[in-house]
């Protein structure tokens, strides 16, 4: 009854299996894709009829990781998976971006793609597997889809590109780039890099696109074998007469409106023209559909702007194609934050702060691929007031998570190593105004705020958003695009990096025919823009401040013998707890004996270091210490001599005469000088008050820690 159709092929170092017809047979299409034990089950359901009045394409992509895939039970209170994590949200966006432009214009039926990770090999990331699965399922479904598309991850190790590197290989790689495309065109690039050149990045894109052709060929073969018949869907016929009538009423006026350089004023004028045009047409014929008129007006708007750009005329706000809007750069704008900056580019503005914390502020991420600790956090907030609107304020949306991750990628390559700068760093970008590329403004602001906070970043980084308009062989690359140009162009891409190279590259391409040469021109123009912005930023602050903020915790590092770690921690953590309370510091101990002491006050840190050195000091036989009586027994007394160490003064060693009763000579808590007679193999210490008193040398001052009193 179940007769699965399977295709197997070699993809780089992995074997990929596509299987359909076995599960979820009521879905429009379903595919199980596996790559060396990492398996993702992808389903597609498409509605045959569009909702009446639907004016946009309702595509939903859900990506969900199941912990059973890694043989684990969720650690949450309810012991089941909750809402999508940040990582799942980012992969859902990664699947969505290359498939969205492959649906035909005018197709507004609801489509839902659900990718479920059901098995995971910790060396094979499920994101590429899920992207291949979505492409295969849509191609099999019969839904109008101009695919299939492939997907590949590209690494760069020892000056060689590596296809789909394993997780271990990625740690050695200077690049982590995901590229997706069809047979003829690249559609999407998402990457982070350790400051590689434009040519190296472009080479990786081309390499990934060439290598993924095997995926596309195999999906096509599977479709021949198991594909469902294509839907008989036709786009609505174009009403030429109505288009001409709308153009006659509005085209010239819209062209004039787009010469207004102020965003709010321009929007107001465009709204007036649209509403007047629609009112005029509805007065002539009330059977017309207002939504359809709105769409025609939008298409006219798009053509007005595109044709002006292609004709070499100034852009919407009066700039030439490679001009960047006016920049205003300020640092140290908030008095109590550890680092802050206000970065303004035209009508886009970001208030960015940097906060320093200790290792215990790091985020522990319990991911499917295993647990990891993140010591660099980047959060991006996009409040509705930034575009002059009202709206919900609450937990971050998909877009904010995606933009925050892109900005983080832009900065990650220049962050110092933990051994040189042992702080957890959190950067928050508040977008206070937005008109184009707020994520790249966040990169610039983050670089400034980190320098202001005294974080020794390896270089300043800046980001820029670029656009491309293409008609036939004629194309124009635009630097620093506005929000309006973003929607009207054929490709938009964002590049972040330093003077030396690229740290992050994100591309979204909506058309075919974007060649390697065009991408080369675009990347080189972006480099010029990036260097210009870096020049302006350097006038405000050209190197990290020599010292961190007085309000930031200072971390002092000392080394102790790993065998002594247990002494510093104490029984059940008693010693370290008492130390942190006594000194007002935060103390972290690593397995190799590295001790990090964080304090906002230098004196407190010195006190903590002194106490730890006392605790870890070796007990010297023959030396006299100041001790404190902690326990009295019939045969003598136990005396703490600091460092959590306790020794026995035998009754015969209390005085130089016979002692009948210990309490005649000693009381609990009494401070007495003691001489170390012996430390045996088991670390037990024999002490003498008698010999210490006889000896005239001054006692070595070593106080017992508070935790040891009254034990």
Swiss-Prot record:
Enzyme Commission number(s) from the entry: 2.7.7.8
GO biological process, one term: RNA processing
Biased composition (Low complexity): 698-711
A GO cellular component annotation in the UniProt record: cytosol
Methyltransferase recorded as keyword: no
Coiled coil: none
A single MF term (Gene Ontology): magnesium ion binding
InterPro entries: ExoRNase_PH_dom1, ExoRNase_PH_dom2, ExoRNase_PH_dom2_sf, KH_dom, KH_dom_type_1, KH_dom_type_1_sf, NA-bd_OB-fold, PNPase
Keywords carried by this UniProt record: Cytoplasm, Magnesium, Metal-binding, Nucleotidyltransferase, RNA-binding, Transferase
Disulfide bonds: none
SMART domains: KH, S1
Region (Disordered): 690-711
Gene3D superfamilies documented for this protein: GHMP Kinase, N-terminal domain (3.30.230.70), K Homology domain, type 1 (3.30.1370.10), Nucleic acid-binding proteins (2.40.50.140)
Annotated compartments: Cytoplasm
Cofactor: Mg(2+)
Domain KH: 553-612
CDD domains: KH-I_PNPase, RNase_PH_PNPase_1, RNase_PH_PNPase_2, S1_PNPase
Positions of the S1 motif domain: 622-690
Keyword check for Zinc-finger: no
Purpose of the protein: Involved in mRNA degradation. Catalyzes the phosphorolysis of single-stranded polyribonucleotides processively in the 3'- to 5'-direction.
Family: Belongs to the polyribonucleotide nucleotidyltransferase family.
UniProt xrefs under NCBIfam families: polynuc_phos, PRK11824.1
Assembly with partners or alone: Component of the RNA degradosome, which is a multiprotein complex involved in RNA processing and mRNA degradation.
HAMAP family xref list: PNPase
Protein known as: Polyribonucleotide nucleotidyltransferase
């Amino acid at each position: 009854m179940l007769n699965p159709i399977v295709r197997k092929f070699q993809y780089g170092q992995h074997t990929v299996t596509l299987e359909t017809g076995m599960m979820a047979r009521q879905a429009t299409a379903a595919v199980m894709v596996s790559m060396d034990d990492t398996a993702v089950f992808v389903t597609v359901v498409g509605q045959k009829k569009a909702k009446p009045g639907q004016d946009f394409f309702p595509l939903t992509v859900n990506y969900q990781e199941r912990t059973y895939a890694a043989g684990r039970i969720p650690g949450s209170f309810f012991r089941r998976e909750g809402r999508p994590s940040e990582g799942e949200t980012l992969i859902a966006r990664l699947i969505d971006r290359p498939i969205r432009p492959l649906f035909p214009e005018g197709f507004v039926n609801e489509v839902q793609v659900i990718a479920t990770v059901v098995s995971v090999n910790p060396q094979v990331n499920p994101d590429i597997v899920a992207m291949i699965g979505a492409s295969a399922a849509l191609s099999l479904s019969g839904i109008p889809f101009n695919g299939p598309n492939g997907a590949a991850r590209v690494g760069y190790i020892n000056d060689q590109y590596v296809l789909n590197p394993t997780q271990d290989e990625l740690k050695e790689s200077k690049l982590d780039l995901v590229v997706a495309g069809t047979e003829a065109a690249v559609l999407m690039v998402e990457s982070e890099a350790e400051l590689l050149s434009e040519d190296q990045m472009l080479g990786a894109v081309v390499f990934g696109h060439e290598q993924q052709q095997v995926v596309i060929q195999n999906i096509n073969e599977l479709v021949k074998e198991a594909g469902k018949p294509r839907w008989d869907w036709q786009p609505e016929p174009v009403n030429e007469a109505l288009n001409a009538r709308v153009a006659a009423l509005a085209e010239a006026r819209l062209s004039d409106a787009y010469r207004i350089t102020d965003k709010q004023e321009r929007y107001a004028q465009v709204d007036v023209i649209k509403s007047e045009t629609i009112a005029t047409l509805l007065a002539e014929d009330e059977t017309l559909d207002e939504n359809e008129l709105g769409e025609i007006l939008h298409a006219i708007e798009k053509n007005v702007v595109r044709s002006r750009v292609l004709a070499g005329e100034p852009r919407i706000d009066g700039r030439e194609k490679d001009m960047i809007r006016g920049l205003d750069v300020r640092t140290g704008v908030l008095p109590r934050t550890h680092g802050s900056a206000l970065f303004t580019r035209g009508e886009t503005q970001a208030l960015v702060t940097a906060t320093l914390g200790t290792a215990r502020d790091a985020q522990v991420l319990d991911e499917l691929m295993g647990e990891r600790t993140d010591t660099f956090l980047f959060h991006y907030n996009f409040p509705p007031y930034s575009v002059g609107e009202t709206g919900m304020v609450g937990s971050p949306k998909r877009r904010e998570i995606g933009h925050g991750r892109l900005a983080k990628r832009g900065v990650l390559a220049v962050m110092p190593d933990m051994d040189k700068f042992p702080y957890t760093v959190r950067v928050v970008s508040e977008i206070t105004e937005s008109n184009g590329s707020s994520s790249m403004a966040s990169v610039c602001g983050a670089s400034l705020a980190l320098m202001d906070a005294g974080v020794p970043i390896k270089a300043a980084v800046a980001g820029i958003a670029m656009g491309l308009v293409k008609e036939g062989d004629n194309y124009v690359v635009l630097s620093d695009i506005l929000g309006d140009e973003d929607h009207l162009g054929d490709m938009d891409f964002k590049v972040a990096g330093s003077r030396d190279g690229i740290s992050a590259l994100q591309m979204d391409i909506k058309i075919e025919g974007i060649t390697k040469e065009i991408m080369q021109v675009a990347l080189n123009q972006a480099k010029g823009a990036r260097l210009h912005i870096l020049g302006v930023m350097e006038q405000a602050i050209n190197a990290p401040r020599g010292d961190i903020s007085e309000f930031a915790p200072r971390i002092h590092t000392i080394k102790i013998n790993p065998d002594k770690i247990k002494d510093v921690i104490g029984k059940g953590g008693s010693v370290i707890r008492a130390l942190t309370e006594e000194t007002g510091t935060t103390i972290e101990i690593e397995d190799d004996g590295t001790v990090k002491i964080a304090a906002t006050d230098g004196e407190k840190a010195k006190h903590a270091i002194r106490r730890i050195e006392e605790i870890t000091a070796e007990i010297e036989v023959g030396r006299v210490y100041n001790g404190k009586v902690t326990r009295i027994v019939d045969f003598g007394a136990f005396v703490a001599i600091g460092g959590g160490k306790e020794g026995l003064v035998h009754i015969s060693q209390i005085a130089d005469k016979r002692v009948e009763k210990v309490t005649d000579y000693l009381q609990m808590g009494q401070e007495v000088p003691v001489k170390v007679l012996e430390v045996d193999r088991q670390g037990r210490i024999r002490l003498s008050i008698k010999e210490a008193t006889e000896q005239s040398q001054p006692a070595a001052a070593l106080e017992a820690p508070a935790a040891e009193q009254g034990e």
